[in-house]
Amino acid sequence: MLKIEMDKYEPISLIGKGNFGSISKIRRISDGKILVWKELDYGKMDEKEKHHIVSEVNILRDLHHPNIVKYYDRIIDKKSTKIYIIMEYCPRGDLSQLIKRCKRSHEYISEDVIWKIFTQVLSALYACHMHKEGKILHRDIKPSNVFLDNENNVKLGDFGLSRMLSNESNFAYSNVGTPYYMSPEQIDENRYNEKSDIWSLGCCLYELTSLRPPFEATNHLSLALKIKAGKVQRIPVKYSDELNRVIMWMMTVNQDSRPSVENLASLPQISIRIKERKIKESYAKLKILEDNIRGREERVKEKEIELERREKYLDEREKMLKEKEEIFNN
């Protein structure tokens, strides 16, 4: 059974490697579609780390959104204690790679692109925070967890640290995430909610504009003190006051004063992009419908032509038979 499942895919190349496994580009044999699989050795993990894997699989399986990395399948090899999580392939890498390229070339990312990325990550977060079965906290939003597909559309991924909160429970406890992007309440190991994701997204946007994290330090204690103070410089002056204000709002030290996904979605720069996207999606659906109708019309036309051809053939046959009858009768 395992061999049958594994034989559905052909490994192409290694993308990355970590402590517990690797990520490889693969090809689905049935249709040639390029995907990735995350190969993890759960035999080396403690119970907490195993829980992170189960959490990622369960959350990805339930989340269906154009700005969230799509989950396809999972294969478990109990003999070698490995799990293969099969997901969408994002060929243009992640935002950390984009930031590095911009730093090397001494070029800033245009404000329009920043707003586009902002809108798409926010759309993904909206799907998480407003999930019908309970809020899903990502808990590790950072540039390297935001991927780009072939058309530079944003895909939020790596839900290994995610946690679902029931509608009755509004807060989580535990120190998780990447230190540079952790919220003050996470640093202090206090209770936190979905507003921690908003802080982390604000940090990502700051880094996209400034090409460096908002808080930098040589040790964890110094970094923690800077994050808790929450003092950051303005983003480069080439960017608008509007964008700067929104980023600073997202990075408010008091989580109760930070915006929600709903607050951010109602901002003019965001709402207009969401509307434009909905119009494009509606147009794309309409075009598919039109193409289907056109295809059906063409098939009907082909059938009509075929019927006419057969009728003509039958008429000619009938005419020939009549002529033969007349000859024999004479």
Segments and roles (model prediction):
Residues 12-19, 23:
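Protein kinase glycine-rich loop
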Residues 22-44:
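Glycine-rich ATP phosphate-binding loop
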Residues 53, 57-58:
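Regulatory alphaC helix of protein kinase catalytic domains
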Residues 70-83:
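Short beta-strand micro-motifs within the conserved protein kinase catalytic domain, predominantly
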Residues 117-118:
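Activation segment signature within eukaryotic-like protein kinase domains
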